[in-house]
Design a protein with these regions (language model features):
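Glycine-rich, Arg-bearing micro-motifs that act as flexible, cationic patches
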Residues: 118-142, 156-160
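Short glycine-rich, flexible loops that bind phosphorylated cofactors or substrates
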Residues: 28, 100, 124-126
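General small-molecule cofactor/ligand-binding pocket signal
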Residues: 48-50, 91-95, 148
């Protein structure tokens, strides 16, 4: 009896062509970028980076905010450099919206995103509860694509028994 090795034609279990990584400029961004890098490494896939500038209702939605745009450019520039260093194709975007969650969901639908990977800053509430903020729950409820959230361990949590 002769056994021959078949060429490995299996497809990876998880394949994504377009991953959206919303960036807020917090410590929660790095784990999301690292996961997107792992998922897209060695593929023709693309990471779509988005920073949303939330505009308060007191201001016009299209009002210019040079400081916020400069902050967004800095965040997106660093993230783009990290991903391109790892051979990942990158698309970047800045959106102005009243709420970041709606802008993220709209971008995901418009770009036909396969997966959203976002960081979650875990905040404790009195009485032992926790708070995920407004954006992550909104995206999880309304996204046209699967959403993977990575909870970041903050200094507060690291010292909690």
């Amino acid at each position: 009896m002769v056994f021959r090795r078949r060429p490995d034609k299996r497809t990876p279990l998880l394949t994504f062509e377009r991953i959206l990584v919303p960036l807020a400029g917090t410590e929660a961004d790095e784990p999301a970028l690292r996961l997107a890098t792992l998922l897209l490494a060695g593929t023709e896939g693309q990471a779509s980076l988005l920073h949303v500038i939330e505009v308060p209702f007191e201001r016009q939605l299209d009002a210019e905010d040079p400081a916020a745009v400069a902050f967004a450019d800095e965040i997106l520039g660093k993230a783009e450099a990290f991903l391109t260093e790892h051979g990942i194709q990158v698309r970047t975007g800045i959106a102005q919206a009243r709420a970041a969650g709606a802008a993220i969901v709209d971008d995901a639908a418009e770009q036909r995103i396969d997966l959203i990977v976002m960081g979650l800053r875990y905040k404790k509430r009195p009485g032992g509860g926790w708070d995920a903020g407004r954006t992550v729950p909104y995206v999880m409820r309304n996204s046209p694509a699967p959403v993977w959230c990575l909870r970041v361990e903050t200094e507060d949590l690291a010292n909690t028994p």
